C-alpha cells in the first residue's frame, strides 16, 4: 500500500507541475476550462464503482491469493529444478476477468487516471511474490544439498574407517549416528571426521589442524599402541614364563640340550647329599627299581669336581661301558640333546639302566628241550649260491621279491629274512664301524647295547675300562 500511495502522490505532482506544458500525459493548464474538467473527473472517479481504492483493494487481494496458492503448490510439488512456476489458479483468472471488463467506466479506459501504462502497483506485488517464492525454493535447495552432503560424508567415513573400534563415549560424532547408531568412535577418529572437508570446501585447508595434522595423528596412534602393548602381555611370552617356572617337564624344556644335566649350585648339592645319605638303601633290593630312582637321584648327587656327562647305569658290579670317558676327555664334553635319550636305545632292556643278563650255560650232560631252541636250518649249495647272488644285487628285499624268492627256492619267507639279517650283521661286524651316536651314549652310560654279540677281546677291553674307572674313583 505504501507503494500505491507514493505512486498517487507522483501523479498529483505531475498534474500540478508547470514545467512540461506540452507533455502528452497532461493537458493545457493555462485555460480555466481544464481545471473544471479535472474537478468533474475527480468527482466521477470518487463516485464510480470502479474507483482507485476499489481497484487497489481487488489487486491486493489478487496478489495475496497468488502468493498463498504458489506457496501451497511449492510445498505440495517437490520439483526444485522447475523454476518456471507460472501456474495460475482459476480464482485469479476470474478476478482478473472481472477487473478487465472493457466498458466506458472501466479503470483500463482512456478517460481514467490509471491507464494501461499506469499499472505499477499490481506488477510490484507480483514481483515481490515471485521473489519470495524463489527465496523459498533456494532455501529448500540449500537444505537438500546439506542433507546430501551429510549422507555422502557418512558413507565415505563408513568405507574409509575400520569397523573394529574401541567404544569411546567421551567425544561421539553425531554424523556417524545418522546411519549407524550403534557405532562408537574414538576421539582421534572424531577429530578426523571434523577435519574432513566437504565438496564445497574441498580446496580449503582446515585452520584447526593445519598441515601437521597427519603427523600428530600418527604420533597419537603410536603412543596408544605402545601403551596397549605395555599393558597387555603377549600369549607367547606368558606361555614361556609358565613353562620356565611351573612346567619343568614341558616339551620346550625336554627338547633343550641342558635338560637332565647335573645341578651346578654347590649349596643345593650339599642339601641333596645330606638328604640321600641319611637314608641309604641296599643296592640288591633296589636293583629292580634302579631306572626310576637313578634318574631322579644321580643328577643331584654327582660330585662337583666331575665335569662329564651323567652316568645312569648303576649296579653292584659297576658294569658300565665308558661312563666317565667323556669326563676325562676335557672340560666341556659334547652333550647330546635330551630328545636323544628318549629314543629306542634307552628303551631297550640292555640299554645300561639294568645289568646285561645272559643265559646260564648248561652242563654238557643235560639235554636241551625241544621248545627252547629251533633246529638250525641247513641250506643246500644251490640255495646258498642263489641267496648270495641276490644279496650282492640288493641287501634289502622287498616283500614281493622275498615272496618270489621263497617260492623259487622252496623256503619260508622267515628263513630268507633271517638269512639276510645275519648276513648284514656279519658284514657290519667285520667292518668294525659303529654308530657314533651309540658310542657317545655308551660313553655317558645311557646306552649299553650292541646289535652283535661281543667277542672275547671286546669283553677284555670293557673289563680294563671298568678297572680304570674304579681307580679314578678311588683317587678322587
Curated annotation (Swiss-Prot):
Molecular function per GO: DNA-binding transcription factor activity, RNA polymerase II-specific; RNA polymerase II cis-regulatory region sequence-specific DNA binding
Compartment(s): Nucleus
Entry annotated with the keyword Ion transport: no
InterPro entries documented for this protein: Engrailed_Homeobox_TFs, HD, HD_engrailed, HD_metazoa, Homeobox-engrailed_C-terminal, Homeobox-engrailed_CS, Homeobox_CS, Homeodomain-like_sf
CDD domains to which the protein is assigned, alphabetical: homeodomain
Annotated GO CC locations: nucleus
Summary of the tissues where the protein is detected: Expressed in the middle silk gland but not in the posterior silk gland during the fourth molt/fifth intermolt period.
BP terms from Gene Ontology: neuron differentiation
Regions of compositional bias (Basic and acidic residues) in chain numbering: 33-43, 292-305
Cytoplasm recorded as keyword: no
Pfam (any one): Engrail_1_C_sig
UniProt feature coiled coil, ranges: none
SUPFAM superfamilies according to UniProt: Homeodomain-like
Compositionally biased intervals (Low complexity): 318-331
Location of the DNA-binding region in this protein: 372-431
Protein task: This protein might be involved in the compartmentalization of the silk gland.
Name of the protein in question: Homeobox protein invected
Source species of the chain: Bombyx mori
Lineage: Eukaryota, Metazoa, Ecdysozoa, Arthropoda, Hexapoda
Encoding gene per record: INV
